[in-house]
Amino acid sequence: MSISLKKSGMLKLGLSLVAMTVAASVQAKTLVYCSEGSPEGFNPQLFTSGTTYDASSVPIYNRLVEFKTGTTEVIPGLAEKWEVSADGKTYTFHLRQGVKWQDNKDFKPTRDLNADDVVFSFDRQKNTNNPYHKVSGGSYEYFEGMGLPDLISEVKKVDDNTVQFVLTRPEAPFLADLAMDFASILSKEYADNMLKAGTPEKVDLNPIGTGPFQLLQYQKDSRILYKAFPGYWGTKPKIDRLVFSITPDASVRYAKLQKNECQVMPYPNPADIARMKEDKNITLLEQPGLNVGYLSFNTEKKPLDDVKVRQALTYAVNKEAIIKAVYQGAGQAAKNLIPPTMWGYNDDVKDYTYDPEKAKQLLKEAGLEKGFTIDLWAMPVQRPYNPNARRMAEMIQADWAKIGVQAKIVTYEWGEYLKRAKAGEHQSVMMGWTGDNGDPENFLPPLFSCAAAKDGSNYSRWCYKPFEDLIQPARATDDHNKRIELYKQAQVVMHDQAPALIIAHSTVYEPVRKEVKGYVVDPLGKHHFDNVSVE
């Protein structure tokens, strides 16, 4: 970002704040969420982390269509209705009228949402000549990684309340794609005003949306304060204030939850699950995760450009030991990128067994009989797909040492970690993913396509034509059985080429205080508070 949140410290939005603490006295209509980290920014177009989405796209913004909370069902959002042409290449959206924009000290809207806002929100990502395209770094990982610059031929305004998307080809999951975070709608009027004022980056730092909550204050690594947006077009939130108490340590989050300093927390330590189940003041919600934890090998760096080396590093890791020690019963070993609960999963793929001798043989064939050194990046935050990255890194380090590979564990603050990984500084880096739309297309192309290798969300920087020749046709056809077959073949190719060590799928646990009513675990990993109350 051209002006980083790290440097800006506290974002003062010029609003008079009621003095409040995140400690003992939690007011009746205030909910405190113990979040796991600081967001990278407040424009969901620019980032891919769930931490950022929870702080931006979920409370502040809306999309043309939305996922019904707790499901992957697509429902109307800013668009009341839509039509799709017979050839599947033109989508016409009819906008909801009377949708109000939020405001701040720099901007007071003079109009409601209209088609210009929708066109701007997508043109910024697609059009390199758009004056906002390069603002805040201009990295649109989702949009580019999903191949949308080539898919979307045009986004055009039909009239103030109607927008058309013209595609170059049919795309089966396109409607669901528009419910994803990157497709959030931003205010063109706000953008124009900030551009004229010479401060375009404020659009991404001081967000203006149409969503249920409005940002009041952000203090990096401390807290985010929101208020219910009084002009919200949907059902009004049941709480007046929403506070994100940024708490990276899962044990500290749990301690705060026990003391009622927060009412909802994500990503508990697996070791705490049993105690949470016995705690009379806590409701422990759970469901199978639509997720995966993995370790990407940077295939642009030697010796990881050699498939035998990648296979050797994969054979060398005892995944079952990791599942027991790190996930403690809340995960299962993964052999494919997509989770087994998702359609298109290929159960015929045979996972790499734990076989150090096979690993040594492969290194010998690669001319590395004496081993080599490698950096191993460990995530600084807990995620459902990786509840203890440091412990996992130590176990992988020990396993690799047995075959002569010496690993140095590296970590950074979460935002810096992602920034450096996107730039390809790593040799191996721990990452993970929670599905955004319930479609295999949301796992394979964003994480391992050639387009994603260019924009940074393919942390393996792996571009392999036989893989592309399977995943791209799978996106274009609306023949469901054909899509299943193509995705199954793609999983075989990925398994054989081993651009990443695929580690685990986890069960998602969400501990909430008994006073919290209406909270729903989201299969897509988001944390929604607009329909939540605190008694």
Regions found by a protein language model. Give the residues of each.
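Detector for C-terminal structural segments
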Residues: 30-31, 35, 55, 172, ...
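Aromatic- and charge-enriched surface segment that lines or borders ligand/interaction sites
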Residues: 80-131, 164, 303
